[in-house]
């Protein structure tokens, strides 16, 4: 039974990690209705660890899919074209290289990682300095905060898309190579809001920030996905260290839950990522996600504040 629960958690994570609907909110809500068979003294600490570590499986799927753009090294072969960068639908461009003997270094990948590192600075500082303090205040009202943030961010998505349509604003940044370090830093600050307030959605916050800063939808999504790699890896490491520091040790059953959930999230993510990239590349907007968030948030508030009271 625990394995089946772990598979369900993995499916939910694999789908929602790549949509701006807050995967953490979905996992927390699922845990409210479908709990693992854990001892009371370990349940809270384990689920806090679980909700972060399970995301590593999903992130690994994206690393494999986008490996060619993320990995900056290769073998020097034919001379790379130095002509003007070619624009593509999904925000990826031609990649000139530096050659060092037999080693070739892709310029765009190096510059992308520099911008990712800059965007990670706010989240790193938050995780080290404020994470525990903020969690102390938000834990008691977690489901209420989730409901409110699902609705608020959903409304922001609708407003941003309406603004783009009414003003017929064309994106200023249509390629990842055109993304400035200042823009990357602001997007990184948006991540902190998501880290502090459950239900915000890390991808939702960064995509909204990107759209407001003039990024095209494909570029906003691509950078959001790229940024998830070090962000979630770092968050998982931080949670694991805290778990160990508190003297807790994973049992065989808990380790099985983590592995099964992560592997499931990994497999499901291949489908979810591909569908999301196809959806955005066809110039579709984020209104459906905004509407979904509002409906889910309203349902959460109705249940926990009125029905469950």
Stretch-by-stretch model annotation:
Residues 1-309:
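Multi-pass membrane proteins that catalyze or facilitate reactions on polyprenyl-/lipid-phosphate substrates
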């Amino acid at each position: 039974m625990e394995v089946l629960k772990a598979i369900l958690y993995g499916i939910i994570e694999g789908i929602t990690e790549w949509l701006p609907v807050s995967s953490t909110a979905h996992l927390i809500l699922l845990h409210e209705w479908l709990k693992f068979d854990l001892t009371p003294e370990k349940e809270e600490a384990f689920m806090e660890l679980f909700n972060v570590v399970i995301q590593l499986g999903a992130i690994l799927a994206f690393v494999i899919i986008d490996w060619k753009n993320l990995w900056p090294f290769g073998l020097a072969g034919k001379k790379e074209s130095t002509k003007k960068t070619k624009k593509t639908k999904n925000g990826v461009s031609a990649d000139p290289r530096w050659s060092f003997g037999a080693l070739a270094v892709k310029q765009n990948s190096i510059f992308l990682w520099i911008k990712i590192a800059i965007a990670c600075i706010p989240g790193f500082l938050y995780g080290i300095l404020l994470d525990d303090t903020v969690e102390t205040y938000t834990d008691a009202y977690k489901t209420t905060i989730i409901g409110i943030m699902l609705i608020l961010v959903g409304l922001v998505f609708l407003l941003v898309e309406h603004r783009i349509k009414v003003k017929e604003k064309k994106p200023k940044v249509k390629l990842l190579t055109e993304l400035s370090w200042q823009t990357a830093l602001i997007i990184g600050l948006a991540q902190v809001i998501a880290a502090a307030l459950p239900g915000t959605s890390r991808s939702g916050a960064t995509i909204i920030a990107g759209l407001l800063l003039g990024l095209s939808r494909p570029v906003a999504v691509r950078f959001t996905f790229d940024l998830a790699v070090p962000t979630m890896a770092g968050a998982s490491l931080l949670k694991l260290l805290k778990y160990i520091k508190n003297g807790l040790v994973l049992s065989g059953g808990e380790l099985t839950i983590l592995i099964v959930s992560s592997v499931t999230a990994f497999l499901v993510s291949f489908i979810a990522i591909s569908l999301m990239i196809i959806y955005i590349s066809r110039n579709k907007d984020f209104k459906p996600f905004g509407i979904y968030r509002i409906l889910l948030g309203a349902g959460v508030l109705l249940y926990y504040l009125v029905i469950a009271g």
